[in-house]
Every structure is written in C-alpha cells, then in structure tokens.
Amino acid sequence: MEININEVLFVIPARGGSKRLPKKNIKPLAGKPLICYSLDIARQLTDDGNICISTDSDDIISVVSDCGYHVPFKRPDELASDTATTNDVLVHAVNYYKQLGMDYKYLVLLQVTSPLRRKEDITNVLSLIDDTCDMVVSVRKSHAASVMCRSEERRVGKECRSRWSPYH
C-alpha cells in the first residue's frame, strides 16, 4: 500500500525541562543541536507544513527557528510536566491540526533522542502499514543492564551488584 506523504504528520516532542541532562534536546551532537537531526530527517520526507515540533521551551523554539522552522504552537504547561505522557502530547498536536482543518491519516513520532535514524528507516516502516496493520512501533533488544526495577521505597532505578543507582 502506497502512503501519500502529505497524509502523514511528523511530530517531534521536545520538552525543555529534562531533569537528568538539562537542555538535552538542544545540546550539540557532532556540532549540531540534537533536535536538528529529527527535524532534518523529517524534512527529507516532507515539507515543514507536515512537521510539528511540540515544545514548551523558548530555547528550543529559538534553535529550530535558526534552522528556518516555525513552531506552530507552544505546548501548554500541563503537557510539559513530568506526568504528561507522549500520548497526551500527540493527541494535543493532532487536535491542533484538526482545528485548522488538517486531518492526517498517519502519525510518525520522531523522538529527539534517536538521532541516528535514516530516511530509509522511516520509509521502510511506513511501507509496513496496510489494511491489516495500522500501527508500527520500532523497538530494540534490551540488555540486562538496562532493566528497570522498583525498590521498596518505590524509587525506579537499576540494580547494580545489590546497590541502587539512577536509571540512565
């Protein structure tokens, strides 16, 4: 099944309030802000009108503006909290575009923290969608060292030789 790329909304969620690595979404990676990798790959597939960077951060807005991208809206504070889910952010973005009369058939989530994806990765995933498959999720094999556990104090972390350390 051939997908019309203009029926695809590419959403790049980029919250400004990272706790473990402040401003991680705009930190340079190989001389380029991390978020720009996701924006660039989306631009290889579609035009800016089908790309939504959902952010609450003026710094992120400034960085992507320097790349010539106009952020369509600033994410509401309640969707930039530690308790807001990615699903909440995606629903907000889809509803924003619906109010503008743009009803996308497909949604591609581009996490800023996955900068190594290629155009072919996305087109290959989109080619998997058909009448019997309406959702595709990319995953990777997990290593035992990455398994998250919860202590009796309800802290989330990873167990390293019977000691707790923050999960990375």
Regions found by a protein language model. Give the residues of each.
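Hydrophobic targeting segments
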Residues: 7-12, 35, 50-53
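Short phosphate-binding loop-to-helix
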Residues: 58-108, 116-117, 124
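N-terminal nucleotide-binding beta1-loop-alpha1 segment
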Residues: 1-22
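Conserved acidic residues
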Residues: 8-9, 49, 70, 105, ...
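Conserved SAM-binding loop
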Residues: 27-28, 53, 109
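A short, N-terminal amphipathic alpha-helix
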Residues: 34-50, 62
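Conserved core of the sugar-phosphate nucleotidyltransferase
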Residues: 86-88, 92, 106, 112-161
